[in-house]
Amino acid sequence: MKKLIFCLILAMLSQTFGSFGQEKTIWKIGENDNSPDKMALAPDQYRQFLASDFGYEDNYFLVGHSKAEKDWPYVLPGPANDWGGTATLSGIRANFLNINFELKQKPSSGNWKFTLDILQTDPVNAPLLQVIMNGKAWKFKLNKGNGSKNPEGDFSNAKEQLISIDVPNDLIRAGNNEIVITVPEGGWLAFDQVKLEGPSETRLDLPKEILLKNITAANYETLLNGKNFQPLLIDLQHIKGSPSIQVKLDGSVILSQKIEQGRYVLEAPMPEVSAEKSSQYEIYLNHQLLRKGEVKRAPKAIKTPADYVNTMLGVAHSRWMIAPGPWMPFGMVKLSPDNQNTGWQAGYDPAFESIGTFSHIHEWTMTGLGTFQRQAR
């Protein structure tokens, strides 16, 4: 009997330790060595953060392509830090660090953990850390640091803080995944390491020429050559080269396009349907199958050119803001010159502020006309 109990305990222990052993580091940025030296701008070039093009919403660190020493800053400023873009004339600036990683294979079950090893924080203004993974957000109020006012010098005696997030398995997906790290309140934080752990069967994919971010059916129809189409929206990011994309719907080619630079949201025209219907799509990169899946189609309302207008687009980093007013029709929208270099920003950041009723007319002046931003149809 004692022998049986001993064997049962041994079996349970082996299963327990075996389950721990099934997790592995999927990817990491930096080393857990209490030093930021292997990251960009380290150890004291924090004032070059904006000039080095860090913090902008459309920049990203792509696992498998980007290099920490060049593409990941050792420090992330908060709105309390003037060197991060916040100033009296320019308003409050939010900075973002985006991580994209693509999974070739995602296990149906398993444990995932995202870890931020924070080496040091602002000793005056404790940062509020926000992490957004595939749309789900977590917030953490960090403690004030024990070092100098600015992130420079020796970090050997730093007050390290470890943030671990148990990520739900259903939040991770095959294909592209995105993590956004920002500090909406408080001051700076310095990184020691950022990493993701997951099941040992997980396989990273390394996109070569494009990053396929998302594929979905549009909730509208467009008019093309007198016919209605419901677009298949293909959100992708150019990486390198001049690759060609081909989209097939139920075996028929509906779009062919060369990808050259930047981010695209392609509208592949799916013929309109009179009732809900499921179809199969295939996406080819340079004539090689990249992704396939099912899309649900349905009748939708027509989208006009005015519906594409976003009156807030770009305002967070524009020198003179949006300029509607009595000197031009209220239904029109005009973006005034973005005449500052990349290390300076002005305008209104929608992460903090909202534009109510005012109008900028010709210059850096607000008037009380009570003009709302809108576009005509």
Q: Where are the regions that the model predicts?
A:
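Positively charged n-region of N-terminal signal peptides that target proteins for export
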Residues: M1-L4
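Bacterial N-terminal signal peptides
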Residues: C7-Q15
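Beta-strand-rich ligand-recognition modules
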Residues: Q22-S109, D117-R203, I259-P271
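Contiguous beta-strand segments within globular domains
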Residues: G91-F101, P107-T115, A217-D235
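Short, aromatic- and glycine-rich surface loops/edge beta-strands on solvent-exposed regions
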Residues: E178-T182, V247, E276-H287
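Short, compositionally biased P/S/T/A/G/V-rich stretches that sit at domain boundaries
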Residues: V194-G226
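Accessory carbohydrate-recognition regions in carbohydrate-active enzymes
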Residues: K227-P231, H238-P243, Q261-R263, M270-Y284, ...
